Amino acid sequence: MATIEFIEAREILDSRGNPTVEVEMILDDGTQARAAVPSGASTGQFEAVELRDGDKKRYSGKGVLKAVENVNEKIAEEVLGCDASEQRIIDQIMIELDGSDNKGKLGANAILGVSLAAAHAAADCAELPLYQYLGGPNSHVLPVPMMNILNGGAHADSDVDIQEFMIAPIGAESFKQAYEWGAAVYHSLKKVLKDKGLATGLGDEGGFAPNLPSNAAALDLILDAIKAAGFEPGKDVALALDVAASEFFEDGKYTFEGQAKTSAEMIAYYEGLIAKYPLVSIEDPLDEEDWDGWAEFTKKLGEKIQIVGDDLFVTNPKRLAKGIETKAANALLVKVNQIGSLSETIDAVELAHRNGYRCMMSHRSGETEDTTIADLAVALSTGQIKSGAPARGERIAKYNQLLRIEEELGDSAEYAGASAFPRFQA
């Protein structure tokens, strides 16, 4: 395998108009690769640190020139000459160079940019698609696209508490068909909203962001859209939520729909939703430090529904290990920039799978045209991916890459479908 001959980072803009890091890499055989780093709006307090400049004169303090400089001057000096295929060694060099427990010195955005660029370069050098290079010749499962078609919470300016209302085309026979169904429901929802005189402005992730009286009202609108598009809710297209409960948790209480609620009251609320709606997955239903609540929720409803830890686990093997020990959640949300390196991301997924936890690959609200997570979803057999609505270039870039992968795999491609969720297990 070729060695790393050149590395250069630059500051680019993400889908929210905020700066992020992009890294170019050239190997000594001439192979060139590039990777860009995403950024979140609702972030868990235990995530790896995204290094920002803090200079209010540039991009309201959100510039990433320090992270860029750390790549070009500090990281490059250590990894130039490394074999590009030695992913774990490259990542470990950067982690040790940083020396902190949260990548706060060099910046997770600096480290991840180099980590992902190295993987792309090594795959290109080996003349393999990224998903096959990382996952091996048996990588063939296409994930269910969890499409965020209605936004609330931190992703929208509305009265809806729940951050993401997603559709999951579980009844489709292929990713291509699932993508088509998702787009059909998305356009159907736009018509439903228009017919009711509701706004059709978009949130960060391409979903609609109308001002609605309640979270149940949002679910009812989506059910109407599914039916209007000619699909059967629960059989063809199911529902999923990302509550992002840490965003409205303070002083031991959840301020939800205008009332202060306890963990037990929130669990009872979700129990009612699961009984009424065809929900297959609920992400971050409780605060990231409410371990007892998570364990109780999982004990009570874990056989019926996927309970996903995002802010709870932050793609961190150590926090996931605590979740496994305390029986909190039954699925891991996978965000490469939460942990800040590819090898640690893979470690988290492998730990989850070994312990019977499902995984959902995920974008961030601040995205670029980078498609790495699409390949990762197939490489790591996550069976699920969320990359926003079937709209906006930075969202569909990932879904379109999955179309290409499915086409390339041909008859060996398998769509995860309903089997990806506990609600449909025998």
Curated annotation (Swiss-Prot):
Its cofactor is Mg(2+). Its main location: cytoplasm. Gene3D superfamilies: Enolase-like C-terminal domain, Enolase-like, N-terminal domain. Pathway: Carbohydrate degradation; glycolysis; pyruvate from D-glyceraldehyde 3-phosphate: step 4/5. It is found in: Cytoplasm; Secreted; Cell surface. Its EC number is 4.2.1.11. Binds a second Mg(2+) ion via substrate during catalysis. PROSITE patterns: ENOLASE. NCBIfam families: eno. This is Enolase.
